[in-house]
A protein has these predicted regions:
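Residue(s) in the substrate-gating loop at a strand-loop-helix junction
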Residues: 149
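Active-site helix of classical SDR
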Residues: 129, 165, 173
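Short, small/polar-rich loop/turn modules that mediate ligand/substrate recognition or access, typified
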Residues: 95, 181, 186, 243-245
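C-terminal substrate-recognition "lid" of short-chain dehydrogenase/reductases
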Residues: 126, 141, 221-250, 255-256
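Conserved glycine-rich cofactor-binding loop
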Residues: 15, 22-23
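Substrate-binding pocket helix/loop in short-chain dehydrogenase/reductase
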Residues: 105-106, 110-118, 144, 209, ...
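Alpha-helical segment proximal to the catalytic Tyr-Lys
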Residues: 134, 178-182, 241
Length: 257
């Protein structure tokens, strides 16, 4: 039984690239995949936090490498793919976890702000996939995980660009699946509920909002960082080989009731 489970979920010999991997859900996904046996490469804008996170992963016995990239600049997204392949040789698992929500009132959103948020959340995953899927195809195996959101399905105030991008992520996930799954590459999205990350600090800094959102779940609590570990490993492993094009809401039932 243990060998059977090990074979289903073992990621040894795989290399995973996690964008937005220096903090939040990206860091915890990198931790989970690394502990499952994958070599991990993490990418983010700020070198200091990126190096700190890499050190934490290495201290856990994980083989980790860091790459600085600002994915609001799509040329940097393309360059990141080239640098990772040049240094590590291959990418088997791509996790598009970089995110930004500037939380501006609708009437104050500039074209630059709109474009920055769509580039990070929607365009970068598209072009990272475009760059990395062909070398997955050559091995007839690959996993692509996008990060959706509650805002993929419902609107929140002062977050129109973020919500528009996250809605697009759901359809992009289907489009990637349609294009690449016949080559052994699956693409799925994780839709987190409220987790204590930098993006949700305005909620978690307000006890009333924390309580309100917890009460909107079927489980009765908000997400804990460890809650993403199992799903991330599952979608990265052979266990999920017949699942593609899906968005799985990791929200404690927030969108179910």
């Amino acid at each position: 039984m243990s060998q059977f489970i090990h074979q289903l979920f073992d990621l040894q010999g795989k290399t995973a690239l996690i964008t937005g991997g220096s903090s939040g859900l990206g860091e915890d996904i990198a931790l989970a995949l690394g502990l499952a046996g994958a070599e991990v490469a993490i990418a983010a804008r700020r070198e200091g936090p990126l190096l700190d996170t890499a050190a934490r992963l290495i201290a856990q016995g994980i083989k980790a490498t860091s790459f600085v990239a600002n994915l609001s600049d799509l040329e940097q997204a393309k360059d990141l793919s080239k640098r990772v392949l040049s240094q590590l040789g291959q990418v088997d698992i791509l996790v598009n976890a970089a995110g930004i929500n500037l939380r501006e009132p609708y009437g104050e959103v500039s074209p630059q702000s709109w474009q920055e948020q769509l580039n990070v959340q929607l365009a970068a995953p598209f072009f990272m996939t475009q760059a990395l899927a062909p070398q997955m195809q050559a091995r007839k195996w690959g996993r692509i995980i996008n990060i959706a959101s509650l805002q993929s399905y419902r609107a929140f105030a002062n977050s129109a660009p973020y919500g528009a991008a996250k809605g697009g992520v759901v359809q992009l996930t289907r489009a990637i699946a349609q294009e690449w799954s016949k080559f052994g590459i699956t693409c799925n999205a994780i839709g987190p509920g409220f987790f204590p990350t930098a993006l949700t600090a305005p909620v978690f800094n307000n006890p009333d909002l924390v309580k309100m959102h917890a009460e909107k779940t079927a489980i009765g609590r908000n997400g804990e960082m460890k809650d993403i570990h199992g799903l991330a490993i599952f979608l990265s492993s052979d266990a999920s080989a017949y699942i593609t094009g899906q968005t799985i809401m990791l929200d404690g039932g927030y969108t179910a009731i």
